[in-house]
Structures are given as C-alpha cells and as structure tokens.
C-alpha cells in the first residue's frame, strides 16, 4: 500500500491509508522539546504521511499547537487533519505549583483541565478553539472523543446532532466517533449519521472484537473505519514479542500471549516483520480507510512508513485465517 494514496473517500474527503496520531507530540509518556516534536512531524511528512490526527485532550492542547505550527508550513490542500470534540479546555482551579498532567500520561503543566460539554454551543466552541490552536483555516474531520466515558445517551441526543449540523454547514467535511469501546462505536454508527469512526485497539492483528458488531454495523450504514492503536500497547511493535509486555496498562493475559507467539511465528515463516503485518492487517477489510500510528522519534515514523509500503504475501493472511487468528475474508 502507499501512504500517499487515498484508500477511499468519505463525504468527499479522501483519507490517506496511513496517518500519524499526534498524541506523542503532546508529550504523551515523555516530554519532547519543540525541536524534537518538529523533527518527528518532519519525519512523518518526509515519509509521505499526509493524514494527521490530534485532539485537545493530547497534552492539554499542546499537540494541536505543535501540529498546527508544523502544518502551517505545508500546502493546505496536501494533507488531511482530524481533531476531536466533547471536552473543552478550561483553567484549572486546582492547579499545583509545578504540577503536571501525568494522571493522564501527559508531561505538560496542569494549568488547564478538561470539561465535558456535549451541547451544540460546546461543540462549536471546541471547533473554534481547536482551529485557533492549530492555526488552520479548516478542520477536515471531527470525531466525538470517548463519549461513553461521560454519557453516551447524552452524546447521541445532543453532541452527534450538533456534529451533523456543523457538517451540513460545511464547517467540517466529515464527522465520527473515536473510542476503544465496541458497544459505544456500534451504537453511534447505528443511531447517528457518521462518515468515519476511529476504532482504537479493537481491530488489530492480535485481537478483533470489533469484527463481531462494529464492522457489520459499518457495512450496513456505509461508515468507514480508521484503525488506531494497531500495535496493542506496543505488543506488536517488535518482531520478537516480550512476555512482560503490557496490555492496556495491565499484565498480558496468557491467552493473548499464546496468540501473539503463534502470530509472530507465522510472520517469521513468511519473512514479514510483525509490525508490518500489524499495520497492514486492518486494511485487509474494505471498510478500513486508514491506519493511524504514533511515534515519538523520527526513526519510528520512517520505519512505520516502510512497513506500510512493504509487500506482504497473500499466503500470510491465508495462514493466519486458517489458524483462526484473524477473521476469514
């Protein structure tokens, strides 16, 4: 696959098949200097990546600011940018001297806090504030960010209709939901009029719970999918799995470890790096428009783009399917 070739179009929006998830330039897990963050983004651009995903949540706005500063140096029609709504950034009255937002894994000052707001006014404010931080004339794609963490019913009654309204007005080109909860994704697809959904860690080479209900719902409603967190917390990021790897911030269950070992062995038999298979697996489904990967070092972006472009033999997918490690096409 080519990272610069649109995999499909949604709402008139061509989504490149490989995207960069910009949480790391918002100081996720470790602090980056402005120069280090710029180098990461430059590496992504040089590797041909033209889809960039961010959110106010990422570094309390730092990701949007850094990404926007970088993208302002590039031709606007040459990239797609998505951000998210549902939480507004407001002054934090409980800010601690020298305090950091490490409770949310971001190494940034905690001078702001996130406030849920699913009203139309809140959605419009979120868009305006994101545009200001990004410094861009428009946002291509807007996701509602993890609404089930607050109130999914309220989101369906208020936030999604607001997203549909701003799309109809041309404020954004396409709308969706970003979540790692299959039930929330399925309900949103069935009860709202969405163009794309971002499925985080639920349709990966290691496990595919989204295949049961989310993908069928998307097929029924002509909704595209952007697959994120495809490395399963890093478990698939190296060709040789590690038993002490973390799974969703906890210990890796024995059952998943056994699956991981079997998948890695089949990849070795076909001379395919495990991370390459992890990046390309979601795109074996015609519903998946793009795969978004992260990274906090330039070399990671360069390598991921190479993995995305690697030619993988059909026999690999056939053997994985025969072993019932991935769904049968």
From Swiss-Prot:
Reported function: Catalyzes the oxidation of L-fucose to L-fuconolactone in the presence of NADP(+). Also active against L-galactose and, to a much lesser degree, D-arabinose. Uses NADP(+) as a hydrogen acceptor much more efficiently than NAD(+).
Return the InterPro entries for the record. AKR (IPR020471), FDH-like (IPR044477), NADP_OxRdtase_dom (IPR023210), NADP_OxRdtase_dom_sf (IPR036812)
A Pfam family matched by this chain, by name? Aldo_ket_red
Q: Which GO terms describe its molecular function?
A: D-threo-aldose 1-dehydrogenase activity
Q: Which UniProt keywords apply?
A: NAD, NADP, Oxidoreductase
Q: Which family does it belong to?
A: Belongs to the aldo/keto reductase family.
Active site (catalytic residues): 58 (proton donor)
Query: What cellular-component terms does GO give this entry?
Result: cytosol
Q: Where does substrate bind?
A: 145
Temperature notes read: Optimum temperature is 37-40 degrees Celsius. Activity decreases at 50 degrees Celsius.
The EC number(s) given in the record are 1.1.1.122
According to its UniProt record, which reaction does this protein catalyse? a D-threo-aldose + NAD(+) = a D-threo-aldono-1,5-lactone + NADH + H(+)
UniProt name for this protein:
D-threo-aldose 1-dehydrogenase
Activity control, as annotated, is: Inhibited strongly by Hg(2+), Cd(2+) and para-chloromercuribenzoic acid (PCMB) and weakly by Zn(2+) and iodoacetamide. Also inhibited strongly by L-xylose but not D-glucose.
| Description of pH dependence | Optimum pH is 9-10.5.
């Amino acid at each position: 696959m080519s990272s610069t070739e649109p995999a499909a179009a949604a709402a008139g929006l061509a989504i490149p098949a490989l995207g960069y998830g910009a949480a790391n330039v918002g100081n996720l897990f470790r602090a980056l200097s402005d120069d280090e963050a710029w180098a990461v983004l430059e590496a992504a651009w040089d590797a041909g990546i033209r889809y960039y995903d961010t959110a106010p949540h990422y570094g309390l706005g730092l990701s949007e600011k850094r990404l926007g500063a970088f993208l302002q140096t590039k031709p606007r029609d040459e990239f797609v940018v998505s951000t998210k709504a549902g939480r507004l950034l407001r002054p934090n009255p409980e800010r601690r001297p020298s305090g950091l937002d490490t409770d949310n894994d971001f190494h940034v000052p905690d001078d702001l806090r996130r406030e849920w707001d699913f009203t139309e006014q809140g959605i419009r404010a979120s868009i305006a504030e994101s545009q200001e931080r990004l410094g861009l004339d428009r946002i291509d794609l807007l996701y509602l960010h993890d609404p089930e963490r607050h109130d999914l019913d309220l989101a369906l009654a208020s936030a999604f209709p607001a997203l549909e309204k701003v799309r109809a007005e041309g404020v954004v080109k396409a709308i969706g939901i970003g979540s790692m909860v299959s039930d929330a994704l399925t309900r949103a697809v069935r009860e709202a009029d969405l163009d794309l959904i971002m499925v985080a860690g639920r349709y990966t080479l290691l496990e595919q719970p989204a295949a049961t209900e989310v993908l069928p719902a998307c097929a029924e409603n002509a909704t595209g999918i952007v697959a994120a967190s495809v490395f399963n917390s890093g478990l698939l990021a190296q060709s040789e799995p590690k038993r002490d790897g973390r799974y969703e911030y906890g210990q890796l269950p024995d059952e998943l470890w056994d699956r991981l070992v079997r998948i890695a062995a089949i990849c070795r038999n076909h001379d395919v790096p495990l991370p390459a298979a992890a990046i390309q697996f979601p795109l074996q489904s015609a519903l998946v428009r793009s795969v978004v990967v992260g990274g906090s070092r330039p070399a990671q972006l360069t390598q991921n783009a190479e993995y995305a472009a690697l030619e993988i033999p059909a026999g690999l997918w056939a053997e994985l399917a025969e072993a019932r490690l991935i769904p049968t096409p």
